[in-house]
Amino acid sequence: MQRPAFPVNEIARLKDLLSHEILDTNPDEFLDSVTHLAQNVFHVKTVLISLIDADRQWFKSRQGLDASETPRDISFCGHVILQNDIFEISDALEDQRFADNPLVTGNPLIRFYVGIPIKSALGSNLGTLCLIDDHPRKLTQEERAFLVDFKNIIQTYIINQHQNKTFQLIMDSVH
């Protein structure tokens, strides 16, 4: 199993993530609606919005998975935040990086995985939108375009929420 490396900007990325004050927060109805829609559009077992903390990936929204987090060192999403594009594994059992990963050999029995980074306004990869299934497959070009659209919706929402909180803090300090 290949453990994900740390991004070169890891300290700044974590600082940016923590500034969003989104880790370990209550479920968000809007984000849950988006992941539920994605689950139906892509016909996959699991859809997650995963935020990559120092030693774990925490799921802000999840469809088809009971766990609220998993260790970062076995995460697929930890690999995604190292790049800026779609990361797709058509069959994890056939990929040497993941074939013996406990998320492949045990529950949730990942075979298909695709993730795309979710960025902050500063450009940090905070986490991912990912699709998971228990059988091999490959996204079509149309599905890849839809995945980018879903990511953009989520990313814009997270950025707007953060900017609204920042604005409110400024307004509160003025009054």
Segments predicted by a language model, with ranges:
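Signal-transducing coiled-coil/dimerization helices and immediately adjacent hinge/linker segments
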Residues: 163-175
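Intrinsically disordered, low-complexity terminal regulatory regions
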Residues: 1-71
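A short, aliphatic-rich beta-strand micro-motif
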Residues: 111-120
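Amphipathic alpha-helical "output/dimerization" segments
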Residues: 139-156
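Regulatory sensory and allosteric helical modules in signal-transduction proteins
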Residues: 46, 52, 56-62, 67-111
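Short beta-strand-to-loop transition segments that serve as allosteric relay/switch motifs
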Residues: 128-137
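Glycine-rich acetyl-CoA-binding "A-motif" of GNAT/NAT acetyltransferases
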Residues: 125
